[in-house]
UniProtKB/Swiss-Prot annotation:
Keywords: Aminoacyl-tRNA synthetase, ATP-binding, Cytoplasm, Ligase, Nucleotide-binding, Protein biosynthesis, RNA-binding. It is found in: Cytoplasm. Homodimer. L-tyrosine binds at residues 34, 169, 173. A motif ('KMSKS' region) lies at residues 229-233. Signal peptide: none annotated. It comes from Streptococcus agalactiae serotype Ia (strain ATCC 27591 / A909 / CDC SS700). GO terms for cellular component: cytosol. It is an enzyme of class 6 (ligase). Catalyzes the attachment of tyrosine to tRNA(Tyr) in a two-step reaction: tyrosine is first activated by ATP to form Tyr-AMP and then transferred to the acceptor end of tRNA(Tyr). GO terms for molecular function: ATP binding; RNA binding; tyrosine-tRNA ligase activity. This is Tyrosine--tRNA ligase. ATP binds at residue 232. Pfam families: SYY_C-terminal, tRNA-synt_1b. The lineage of its organism: Bacteria, Bacillati, Bacillota, Bacilli, Lactobacillales.
Length: 419
């Protein structure tokens, strides 16, 4: 199966400018292609992973990737299907975020070896050297206002208002494609389906300015089986940066994917062969309660993003927390597994008697409730049940002299911080 048809089989091709021509180009030749990443945050997230992994698949098939960091466009802000205008960031912030994105991309694309090793470019390099007058004369004249207004991403913002800054974004992205086509013979741009209007601005500019042929391929914006935008956990983005979303949190995210989505996501987010995925599908449908598809997803993606060691740590944290074995984990692992649970910083004047501390730290609302919970065996300190109403937190309860973990009932965790 050629690479284009495999991408289609995996559900990774949403729209193309000319499917037959693109398939032929990928089958018969060596294609240089690019994907752009604007530094709109200090990390990429799961939403970016579809395009990143598609880029990697093409590289493995022998084609050459260019990764464009939008040092210039990141200063402007893409209006595509955004309800309101993005807040403008400082140059220093955009540079810092761009550097972090570079580091993350190197985890997925091969930048060091091979004839088709990836190349990193920054559009600030060419936009910083072109004057506004030259840009209007040499680029702007190829775009009619009617053409620009026809883009769906612009139409959706006309009613609420769109600044000229954001309106001009599509020309900037189009010029990126032109520059890469002219200087590196890049003939294919890959991006999310919400980028279609900006991306085809590039093919139009290449056609009109240099009479060249170029292609666009969009990957789908992933939604779950309920239609909800994929890539968020509890309303928050799932980041590729371990400091923003821990490997454990990412592991849990994939483990909790709905049955209806699991096999589809294996095709999109893993490098398992289609035959391997089909075998998993058969086993999964025979015994969905064993969650083979979700466990495989979690293993493959966490290992891909964070490495095998981080994956094994995430599994261990999951197993130990499920068993209530708090002492079997390091403080570092506990902080991963219990990120997001209520934390209380113990003050020097706090009474460390269990009844008082349960109220002070917010575990319960009253001393009466605290006494009832302790008496009924509902309170655990570092995994050990406490039923002594006079129990006082001691140095022995401070894990690595830093935290104490309280559990109320089966699942409600609280962390006491002593630092």
């Amino acid at each position: 199966m050629n690479i284009f048809d495999e991408l289609k089989e995996r559900g990774l091709v949403f729209q193309t400018t000319d499917e037959d021509a693109l398939r032929k180009a990928l089958e018969e030749g060596f294609v240089s292609y690019y994907t752009g990443y604007d530094p709109t945050a200090d990390s990429l997230h799961l939403g970016h992973l579809v395009a990143i992994l598609t880029s990697r698949r093409l590289q493995l098939a022998g084609h050459k990737p260019y990764a464009l960091v939008g040092g210039a466009t990141g200063l402007i802000g893409d209006p595509s299907f955004k309800d309101v205008e993005r807040s403008l960031q400082t140059k220093e912030t955009v540079v810092s975020w761009g550097n972090k994105i570079r580091g993350q991309l190197s985890n997925f694309l091969e930048f060091e070896t091979g004839d088709n090793k990836a190349v990193l470019v920054n559009n600030y390099d060419w936009f910083s050297n072109i004057s506004f007058i030259d840009f209007l004369r040499d680029v702007g004249k190829y775009f009619t206002v009617n053409y620009m207004m026809s883009k769906e991403s612009v139409k959706k913002r006309i009613e609420t208002g769109i600044s000229y800054t954001e309106f001009a974004y599509q020309i900037m992205q189009g010029y990126d494609f032109y520059e890469l086509n002219k200087n590196y013979n890049v003939t294919l741009q890959i991006g999310g389906s919400d980028q279609w209007g900006n991306m085809t601005a590039g093919t139009e500019l290449i056609r009109r300015k240099s009479n060249g042929v170029s292609h666009v391929m969009t990957v789908p914006l992933i939604t779950d089986s309920t239609g909800k935008k994929f890539g968020k956990s509890e309303g928050n983005a799932v980041w590729l940066d371990a400091d923003k979303t821990s490997p454990y949190e990412m592991y849990q995210f994939w483990l909790n994917v709905m049955d209806a989505d699991a096999v589809r996501f294996l095709k999109i987010f893993t490098f398992l062969s289609l035959k391997e995925i089909e075998d998993i599908r058969i086993q999964f449908e025979e015994a969905p309660h064993q969650r083979l598809a979700q466990k495989t997803l979690a293993r493959e993606v966490v290992t891909l993003v964070h490495g095998e060691k981080a994956y094994k740590e995430a599994v261990n944290i999951t197993e130990q927390l499920f068993a209530g074995n708090i002492k079997g984990l390091s403080v570092k692992e506990l902080k991963q597994g219990l990120r997001g649970v209520p934390n209380y910083h113990v003050q020097t004047e706090d009474n460390l008697n269990i009844i008082d501390l349960l109220v002070t730290s917010g575990v319960v609302n009253s001393k009466r409730q605290a006494r009832e919970d302790v008496s009924n065996g509902a309170i655990y300190i570092n995994g050990d049940r406490i039923q002594d109403l006079e129990y006082t937190i001691s140095e022995n309860d401070k894990l690595e002299n830093e935290i104490t973990v309280i559990r109320r009932g089966k699942k409600k965790y609280f962390v006491l911080n002593f630092k």
